């Protein structure tokens, strides 16, 4: 009987000694598990914070298309600004497509695709004035709507002209109606109809100032710029 008791006691002690003592078998919520969880959470939080800081210091590069669209969208103009009379000019127009050649309006305009198309159709239907065969211009000129990227302002400085403008979430182009000489010498002697035996003559393009939307740093501002507006004959008496 005593031998049986000794055998059971020895087996019990061997079982206790052989039991695993690793922290993996510690019950959930014990101090060892809490320390491991806190350490793991702290390391994870620190890793996320470091990742965010790295992303902020090294932002992902933007695509070229995104940068191009951003440069257009950054310049947003309030349409009320154009209602002021001092900013209106018959030679400046904002449109989504090239406007017709006829310049029949006397103020700054905003044309969308449909309006510009209707204006083009109306311009084609207009009857051109018929001149008598004996009437001819002293100088031949050509008129057209153009866009500009740079121009000379009233102070003689070269400025950047805003081509695309965001108005009411729609991109418009800024057009200028220019008139220039087709040829400085429409006839071999110079201007047409000038007595070349007494006068020297030639045709030249003259300019005037109009208000245009320009860029000054990152700000859009109004400036007077020079554009071609007429073709005139210059004469001088022969000596």
Swiss-Prot record:
Family: Belongs to the NGF-beta family.
Keyword tags: Cleavage on pair of basic residues, Disulfide bond, Growth factor, Lipid-binding, Metalloenzyme inhibitor, Metalloprotease inhibitor, Protease inhibitor, Secreted, Signal, Toxin
Keyword 4Fe-4S: no
PROSITE patterns linked to this entry: NGF_1, NGF_2
One of the protein's GO biological processes: negative regulation of neuron apoptotic process
Region feature Disordered, mapped onto this chain: 47-68
Taxonomic superkingdom: Eukaryota
Quaternary structure and interacting proteins, as annotated: Homodimer; non-covalently linked.
Protein name: Venom nerve growth factor
Gene3D superfamilies: Cystine-knot cytokines
GO cellular component assignments: axon; dendrite; extracellular space; synaptic vesicle
Cleaved signal peptide residues: 1-18
Intracellular or extracellular location(s): Secreted
Function of the protein: Nerve growth factor is important for the development and maintenance of the sympathetic and sensory nervous systems. It stimulates division and differentiation of sympathetic and embryonic sensory neurons as well as basal forebrain cholinergic neurons in the brain. Its relevance in the snake venom is not clear. However, it has been shown to inhibit metalloproteinase-dependent proteolysis of platelet glycoprotein Ib alpha, suggesting a metalloproteinase inhibition to prevent metalloprotease autodigestion and/or protection against prey proteases.
Compositionally biased tracts (Basic and acidic residues): 47-66
Presence of keyword Transmembrane helix: no
Disulfide bonds: 139-203, 181-231, 191-233
Removed propeptide positions: 19-125
Molecular function per GO: growth factor activity; lipid binding; metalloendopeptidase inhibitor activity; nerve growth factor receptor binding; toxin activity
Tissue specificity comment: Expressed by the venom gland.
């Amino acid at each position: 009987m005593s031998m049986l008791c000794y055998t059971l006691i020895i087996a019990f002690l061997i079982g206790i000694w052989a039991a695993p003592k690793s922290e993996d078998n510690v019950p959930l919520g014990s101090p060892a598990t809490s320390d491991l969880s806190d350490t793991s959470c702290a390391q994870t939080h620190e890793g996320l914070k470091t990742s965010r800081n790295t992303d902020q210091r090294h932002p992902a590069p933007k695509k070229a298309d995104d940068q191009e669209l951003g440069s257009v969208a950054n310049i947003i103009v309030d349409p009320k600004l154009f209602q002021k009379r001092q900013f209106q000019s018959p030679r400046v127009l904002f449109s989504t497509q090239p406007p017709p050649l006829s310049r029949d309006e006397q103020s700054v305009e905003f044309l969308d695709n449909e309006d510009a198309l209707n204006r083009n159709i109306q311009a084609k239907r207009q009857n051109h004035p018929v001149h008598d065969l004996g009437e001819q211009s002293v100088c031949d000129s050509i008129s057209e709507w153009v866009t500009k990227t740079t121009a000379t302002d009233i102070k003689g400085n070269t400025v950047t002209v805003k081509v695309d403008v965001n108005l009411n979430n729609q991109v418009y182009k800024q057009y200028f109606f220019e008139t220039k000489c087709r040829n400085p010498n429409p006839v071999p002697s110079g201007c047409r109809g000038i007595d070349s035996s007494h006068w020297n003559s030639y045709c030249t393009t003259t300019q005037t100032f109009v208000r245009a939307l320009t860029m000054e740093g990152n700000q859009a501002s109004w400036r007077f710029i020079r554009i071609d507006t007429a073709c005139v004959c210059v004469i001088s008496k022969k000596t």
